[in-house]
Regions:
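Membrane-interface alpha-helices at helix entry/exit sites of multi-pass transporters
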Residues: 66-71, 89-90, 101-116, 270-281
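Transmembrane alpha-helix interface/packing and boundary motifs in multi-pass membrane proteins
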Residues: 76-85, 238-257
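Discrete transmembrane alpha-helix packing/kink hotspots characteristic
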Residues: 83, 123, 289-293
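Hydrophobic alpha-helical membrane segments of integral membrane proteins
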Residues: 94-95, 110, 123, 204-205, ...
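Interfacial segments of multi-pass membrane proteins
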Residues: 96-100, 236, 258-274, 278
Length: 339
């Protein structure tokens, strides 16, 4: 809640003293073609996110059709744009639960989602570190290279050492008895973390998701006619990835603007109205694509539910009719009449 209020405060501070006329001009001059390309790449990013979650569900819960998992992923993303603190993840879990059946508890589905989020965070961390290490960054950002290299080395060391220490078993033993079943289901749902092949496939898909997000940012820079180098797009991508880790207003409103406007102005000389218009364009593109895809997914879920109900009703009617016929006595016909 405090983080959400902080995001709102940052948004209010960013708007105060701003030339609203210049902001309106920047929004009015946006290129529609590049904006459509950014929206398409944002949709592709959400598709990759759903596919990555399906890999985790297959490893830890059940094998589900792609359309149901991608639809649930899109519903959750749409709910995140309307609810604060990423509460839309609950809608994501409940949307996919009806397709799993009664055999898998909610905790196992939530475990698969948590594992997918963890792998997505690992992919984002690797991309951010590689950007800092490889790309020429302006100003003080270039001094972050030793820290980025140290963070990468520490992460690799932890990935190699922690699985051998058996800390998971010790932590599970410290859980109260009444909660061990829930924790065990969560761990079972995150089985993708222990499956080498599934983990690799999921990480590759997450890399595709991040690549689509970066492409969407580049297209939006072109849409707002911002003449900045490639490092600006990478910087915006990294800042938005870090801002997404904080619970905030619906869709990350406030934190996203604070993460984009000041760095673009101080490092690349972009005016505050244009930078704010660009950040609002990022926000509007993400929200619009999520809501449109979520609406389509909800309609698809309702159609599937109606077809399922009709099939079940037809099956019950078909089962009742033979039983009625079996219990019915034959009517006397002409052959049974006595002349």
């Amino acid at each position: 809640m405090l983080a959400a209020l902080g995001g709102l405060g940052l948004l209010v501070l960013g708007v105060r003293g701003l030339d609203l006329g210049a902001l309106a001009t920047a929004l009015a001059q946006v290129d529609g073609g590049w904006l459509a390309a950014a929206a398409a790449l944002q949709g592709l990013s959400l598709l990759f996110g759903g596919l990555a979650w399906r890999v985790g569900l297959t490893a830890g819960v059940a094998r589900l059709p792609v359309r149901h998992v991608v639809g649930a992923h899109w519903i959750g993303q749409a709910a995140n744009t309307l609810l604060p603190a990423r509460l839309g993840e609950v809608a994501r879990v409940m949307a996919v639960r009806r397709h799993v059946g009664e055999g898998a508890p909610v905790a196992r589905i939530a475990g698969s989602l948590a594992a997918q989020r963890l792998l997505g965070g690992v992919a984002s961390f690797v991309v951010v570190v590689m950007v800092i290490l490889v790309m020429p960054l302006p100003g003080l950002l270039g001094t972050f290279r030793p820290w980025a290299g140290g963070a990468l080395g520490l992460a690799i060391l932890m990935a190699l050492v922690l699985p051998r220490l058996g800390l998971g078993r010790c932590a599970l033993g410290m859980v109260p008895e009444r909660l061990r079943g829930v924790v065990a289901n969560v761990v079972d749902g995150g089985r993708v973390l222990r499956s080498g092949r599934a983990r690799t496939v999921s990480l590759v898909i997450h890399m595709g998701e991040l690549g689509a997000q970066l492409g969407s940012i580049i297209a939006l820079l072109r849409a707002f006619h911002m003449q900045v180098p490639m490092s600006a797009a990478l910087l915006v991508f990294c800042l938005l990835a870090m801002a997404s880790l904080l619970p905030s207003l619906p869709g990350g409103l406030g934190f996203n603007q604070a993460a984009v406007v000041a760095p673009l102005g101080s490092l690349y000389g972009v005016g505050a109205p244009v930078a704010l218009a660009f950040s609002l364009g990022i926000q509007a593109t993400a929200v619009g694509v999520a809501l449109l895809g979520g609406l389509v997914a909800v309609c698809h879920e309702r159609l599937c539910r109606s077809h399922t109900c009709r099939g079940a009703a037809a099956g019950r009617a078909g089962a009742v009719e033979p039983s009625r016929r079996a219990g019915r006595r034959p009517r006397p016909g002409r052959a049974h009449l006595v002349p």
